[in-house]
């Protein structure tokens, strides 16, 4: 594991780290047992010294389609740098009239419409079985922490952009957009948003015991409106450009505060410092996923291969101490 004090990982477009108040410290490309990440990871620092790791989900220049994103390597690489919480930014289609293009959302639930093409578990292909809890696919405490701060940042921007919470996002396989029939069906299922990126990211973050939240940016109305043209990539890119500026403002507003909060929780959970423990009681601990895989992994047995335990120790050293 890296000695870098990088507690926050940001996954999104390659331009997200180009903030006025960020200085690039270094670029790293860690090799993991699942290969290399989508792109080299940029470690940047705020004037305060807070470091953040930025990863371009679709590669530099957006060259990797949704079904081919190496999400296992992406999450493992971020964890290897010391990351404890991931903020994932993604363009989404809106399945609700009130969530107009340009709006932001912090979803709380996912409907999985991927097709099994994507590797969705670190345990796949190993001799070790695990069943991670996924009833709440996003980190609820992190979302509650983010909500007032993201809302305040958008209000400060003054463009009238709204923030929605407690929404359900549908993750489709892609790369094609929905048919009109599918889009209408997703609305009937209770879907509010749709994208191609949140899975398997959220599942893998849970297995790696990382807090994970999706900051969704609505770019279009998908294809459910009967009298509107179906969504095109051109529509998405046009709105995404404006949303990108808003995303940068959100990041520059919250990163220092989030780093300080996570650092306090780390100290409290690691050292049991009474002052820090009191601080995280007052403001709920963000690192709720830490230790969550303890009872999800099947007990060690002679049938489990040593090389598999060593592989999984890369992301879960606490649970595979004999192999780390």
From Swiss-Prot:
HAMAP family assigned to the protein according to its UniProt record, in alphabetical order: MTAP
InterPro entries: MTAP, Nucleoside_phosphorylase_d, Nucleoside_phosphorylase_sf, Purine_phosphorylase-2_CS
Family to which the UniProt record says this protein belongs: Belongs to the PNP/MTAP phosphorylase family. MTAP subfamily.
A cellular component annotation (GO) from this entry: nucleus
Protein's organism: Coprinopsis cinerea (strain Okayama-7 / 130 / ATCC MYA-4618 / FGSC 9003) (Inky cap fungus)
Full protein name: S-methyl-5'-thioadenosine phosphorylase
Assigned EC number: 2.4.2.28
Enzyme class: transferase
Compartment annotation: Cytoplasm; Nucleus
A matching Pfam family: PNP_UDP_1
GO biological process: L-methionine salvage from methylthioadenosine; purine ribonucleoside salvage
Main function: Catalyzes the reversible phosphorylation of S-methyl-5'-thioadenosine (MTA) to adenine and 5-methylthioribose-1-phosphate. Involved in the breakdown of MTA, a major by-product of polyamine biosynthesis. Responsible for the first step in the methionine salvage pathway after MTA has been generated from S-adenosylmethionine. Has broad substrate specificity with 6-aminopurine nucleosides as preferred substrates.
Molecular functions (GO terms): S-methyl-5-thioadenosine phosphorylase activity
Keywords, ordered alphabetically: Cytoplasm, Glycosyltransferase, Nucleus, Purine salvage, Transferase
Positions annotated to bind phosphate: 14, 57-58, 90-91, 197
Annotated binding of substrate, by residue: 196, 220-222
């Amino acid at each position: 594991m890296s000695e870098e004090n990088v507690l926050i990982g940001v996954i999104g477009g390659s331009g997200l780290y180009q903030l006025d108040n960020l200085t690039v410290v270094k670029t790293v490309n860690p090799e993991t047992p699942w290969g290399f990440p989508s792109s080299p990871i940029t470690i940047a620092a705020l004037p305060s010294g807070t470091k953040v790791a930025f990863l371009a989900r679709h590669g530099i220049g957006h060259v990797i389609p949704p079904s081919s994103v190496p999400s296992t390597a992406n999450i493992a690489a971020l964890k290897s740098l010391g990351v404890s919480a991931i903020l994932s930014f993604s363009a989404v289609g809106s399945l609700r009239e009130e969530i107009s293009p340009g709006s932001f959302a912090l979803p709380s639930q996912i409907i999985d419409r991927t097709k099994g093409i994507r590797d969705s578990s670190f345990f796949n292909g190993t001799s070790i079985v695990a069943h991670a809890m996924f009833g709440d696919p996003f980190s609820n405490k992190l979302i509650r922490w983010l909500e007032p701060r993201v809302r305040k940042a958008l209000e400060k921007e003054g463009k009238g952009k709204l923030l929605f919470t407690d929404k359900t996002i549908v993750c489709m396989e892609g790369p094609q957009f929905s048919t009109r029939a599918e889009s209408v069906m997703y609305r009937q299922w209770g879907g509010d948003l749709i994208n191609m990126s949140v899975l398997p990211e959220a599942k893998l973050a849970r297995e790696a015991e990382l807090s994970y939240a999706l900051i969704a940016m609505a770019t279009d109305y998908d294809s459910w409106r009967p009298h509107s043209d179906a969504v095109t990539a051109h529509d998405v890119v046009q709105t995404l450009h404006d949303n990108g500026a808003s995303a940068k403002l959100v990041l520059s507003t919250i990163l220092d505060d989030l780093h300080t909060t996570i650092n306090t929780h780390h100290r409290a959970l690691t050292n049991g410092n009474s002052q820090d423990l009191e601080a995280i009681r007052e403001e709920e601990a963000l690192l709720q996923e830490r230790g969550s895989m303890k009872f999800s992994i099947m007990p060690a047995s002679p049938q489990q291969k040593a090389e598999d335990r060593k592989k999984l120790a890369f992301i879960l050293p606490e649970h595979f101490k004999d192999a780390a």
